[in-house]
Design a protein with these regions (language model features):
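Ordered, amphipathic secondary-structure segments that act as subunit-interaction surfaces
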Residues: 80-93, 100
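Helix-start/capping segments and mature chain N-termini
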Residues: 1-77, 99, 103-285
Length: 285
C-alpha cells in the first residue's frame, strides 16, 4: 500500500515542491477542501462530500472545472493505484496563482487541485470508541463556518489548546451556545433523544452528522432534534459525543474535569457508533 499525491493532473513524489509561492491557498487560505473516508477500498458517501465541495466553491466564487463523475474517477484512481483499503483522501482546490493582492480577478485565475490518499491507523480509530476527553473553549471562528475553507486558524488554536491539556479536542461555545467541536460536530443525548445544533452558518454541516440525522438514528428509532443548547444543557446531558469523517461517532467520557455518562461511553452513543460502522462497511455512494 503506497500513499500517493496528485496535483493538477499528475502524480507527484511525496514532498515535491509543486505549489507556487503565489498560490492564493498558500498566501491567504483562499481554498476549499474535503476529507473522504476510504472503507474496504471504496469511498464512503463521496456524493455527499462532492455536494458540499461544490457548495463551498460557489460560496467562495471559485469556478467549478470538474464534473462529479470526473472527481469520482480521480478518487477511484487514487484508491486503485495506492491499493489502500482503509484510509482517507484529502482534496483541496485553491482559487489559483497570482501576485499577492487581496482582491482577485476571476477571469485571470485557474483553480489548483491537490489530492492525496493516506493510510489510517485503524487501531487508533477503534480506540476512540472507548471514549475521549474534551475541554470547553469559546468559539472564535468567523460567521460562515458552513463553508469548508482551509482558513482554520481558530480551529488550529483551539485544537492545540485541547491537546496541550491531554484532551482529544475542544467543544466550542458561542455566546453561551454549544456550536460544535474544533474538528467535529457535537451531539447530546437527554432522555433518549438526540440533540444537535441546527445546520446554520455557525456550524459545518458534517457528512457524518448527516448520516446520524438522516440514516442511522432513524434506523434505530431514535428521535433527533436540531436546536441550540447551552452549557447547562451539556452538563445535564445523559451522553455526549462528537462526529467526524475519520472517527465516526466518538463518545465523550469527560468534559473539562467532569465525567460524562459515568465516565464511560453511553449506551445510545455505542449503538449509533456500531450502526454507523455497519453502514460504512456496506457502503454509500
Amino acid at each position: 500500500m503506497q500513499e500517493l499525491t496528485y496535483f493538477n493532473g499528475e502524480f507527484v513524489e511525496p514532498g515535491a515542491k509543486v505549489i507556487s509561492i503565489d498560490d492564493r491557498g498558500y498566501l491567504f487560505g483562499d481554498s476549499v477542501y474535503e476529507v473522504v473516508r476510504v472503507v474496504k477500498g471504496r469511498c464512503f458517501a463521496l456524493s455527499y462530500h462532492q455536494d458540499r465541495l461544490y457548495r463551498s466553491m460557489r460560496e467562495m466564487d471559485i469556478p467549478v472545472k470538474m464534473t462529479p463523475d470526473d472527481l469520482t474517477e480521480l478518487h477511484e484512481i487514487l484508491i486503485e493505484q495506492s491499493e489502500i483499503k482503509e484510509g482517507y483522501i484529502y482534496l483541496q482546490i485553491s482559487r489559483g496563482v497570482a501576485p499577492r493582492h487581496h482582491a482577485y480577478d476571476r477571469s485571470k485565475l485557474e483553480p489548483q487541485m491537490l489530492m492525496s490518499i493516506r493510510n489510517l491507523d485503524m487501531d487508533a480509530v477503534n480506540k476512540l470508541g472507548e471514549g475521549v476527553k474534551a475541554i470547553a473553549l469559546p468559539d472564535e471562528r468567523w460567521d460562515h463556518v458552513d463553508v469548508k475553507t482551509t482558513n482554520l486558524i481558530p480551529n488550529i488554536l483551539a485544537q492545540t489548546k485541547a491537546e496541550k491539556k491531554f484532551a482529544y479536542t475542544a467543544m466550542l461555545f458561542r455566546d453561551g451556545v454549544c456550536t460544535e467541536g474544533a474538528t467535529s460536530n457535537v451531539f447530546a443525548v437527554k432522555d433518549g433523544i438526540l440533540y444537535t445544533h441546527p445546520a446554520d452558518n455557525h456550524i459545518l454541516k458534517g457528512i457524518t452528522r448527516q448520516m446520524i440525522l438522516n440514516r442511522v438514528a432513524p434506523s434505530l428509532g431514535i428521535t433527533v432534534i436540531e436546536k441550540e443548547f447551552d452549557r447547562a444543557f451539556v452538563d445535564d446531558a445523559d451522553e455526549l459525543f462528537f462526529t467526524d469523517t475519520i472517527g465516526g461517532v466518538i463518545p465523550i467520557t469527560k468534559l473539562d474535569r467532569n465525567p460524562v455518562s459515568g465516565g464511560k461511553p453511553g449506551a445510545i452513543t455505542l449503538r449509533l457508533r456500531e450502526a454507523l460502522e455497519k453502514l460504512m462497511e456496506e457502503g454509500l455512494p
